[in-house]
């Protein structure tokens, strides 16, 4: 028996006393450490993409815009290429590079390694107010982000570029019921519902999320891709011929090339199945045949193909194995500073993007419009939200229709001038205005 009578104190009272004594420690030590470590006086947002930051323009636009709005921006992704100088010099933006893992040991091992790395990154940056992630990719980042936002005070924003499961579905010959595709769909469908806000690149994608995923439409804002300020048309006073002699491009211009009549085309690609560059190469072969057999007045075409990807080697071989006369194809990998310089020097942009989901729009078309380039693009239904036939571009369904569009574009000056005017009108639609409108609609910022 205790001298002080402590033995008579009930257990529940001991527990109450322990909780009482521990509360200050939890409130002033544990909670700040868990949720406020590194807390900024500014509103803080983590923007993350499982992709190369230097070639993720929309993510970089988000970073610039949030910084301009007064946010402290934590920008995370792969650093495989140069990041624009203005991003590096921005005091409101801090970059957190992620290590890139290959899939040599299988997709599961890759996902596990990525997951551990992401958990470490989220823990380090646990005091953020918002998390914005690009989707796709969905796995493993979306489930992890949902867990983080559930146990912290961060609000989750998903920026929908496409649907992750549809990209995986293409790899399995459009078999939706393939176990991996079905799993990817369920992960996307389930975890998307936990996000606080959603941004989509088209109205069609917003409709899909509402009707198929059951997401509240009030949580979704359409934010069309728009070109950044670095994309701008040539001015009338600019000397295009002199600009084509810049170091990054001069060596690719043939000596016999006449810029007064010959045409420069450009396309950017990630050399993936949803963007069949062989269609463009096939149309150029038909163009060569047309020159040889029917029309020796056809102008020369110089086409720049920029980008990297899994099918690149196959396409390069197709070009190397053909004997070209009227067409010259060059493969480039440009810095984020040189790419806009190239676009404004071209006559036409080409897009082979078809969309695995049929719900997204190619960013490259917006960059081309921003540079005053009319576009020739592979048609699919949602493209009507951006490109109007014979107004700001030309559409095609296969390589023969693309060949016809090439002939129109290089031979019919009236067509060229009409769609050029349309592209110049589109060049006035800019990112900042669209971004402010969408984020204000969701009440993330206040104009």
Swiss-Prot record:
Q: Report the pathway entry.
A: Protein modification; protein glycosylation
Kindly state which reaction or reactions the protein catalyses.
Answer: an N,N'-diacetylchitobiosyl-diphospho-di-trans,poly-cis-dolichol + GDP-alpha-D-mannose = a beta-D-Man-(1->4)-beta-D-GlcNAc-(1->4)-alpha-D-GlcNAc-diphospho-di-trans,poly-cis-dolichol + GDP + H(+)
Entry GO terms, CC: cytoplasmic side of endoplasmic reticulum membrane
Q: Which cell locations does it reside in?
A: Endoplasmic reticulum membrane
Q: Which InterPro entries match?
A: ALG1-like, Glyco_trans_1
Query: SUPFAM superfamilies given for it?
Result: UDP-Glycosyltransferase/glycogen phosphorylase
Report how it sits in the membrane: Single-pass membrane protein
- Protein name, per record: Chitobiosyldiphosphodolichol beta-mannosyltransferase
Q: Which Gene3D superfamilies match?
A: Glycogen Phosphorylase B (3.40.50.2000)
Q: Any signal peptide, and if so, which residues? A: none
Q: Name one GO molecular function term.
A: chitobiosyldiphosphodolichol beta-mannosyltransferase activity
Record carries keyword Transferase: yes
Q: Which organism is it from?
A: Kluyveromyces lactis (strain ATCC 8585 / CBS 2359 / DSM 70799 / NBRC 1267 / NRRL Y-1140 / WM37) (Yeast)
| Residue ranges within the lipid bilayer that do not cross it | 128-148
Q: Where are the transmembrane segments?
A: 9-29
Record topological domains on the Cytoplasmic side: 30-127
**Domain of life here?**
Eukaryota
Q: What is its EC number?
A: 2.4.1.142
GO BP terms: namely:
dolichol-linked oligosaccharide biosynthetic process
Q: What does this protein do?
A: Participates in the formation of the lipid-linked precursor oligosaccharide for N-glycosylation. Involved in assembling the dolichol-pyrophosphate-GlcNAc(2)-Man(5) intermediate on the cytoplasmic surface of the ER.
Q: Which keywords annotate this record? A: Endoplasmic reticulum, Glycosyltransferase, Membrane, Signal-anchor, Transferase, Transmembrane, Transmembrane helix
Query: Which ranges sit in the Lumenal compartment?
Result: 1-8, 149-447
Instruction: Name the protein family.
Output: Belongs to the glycosyltransferase group 1 family.
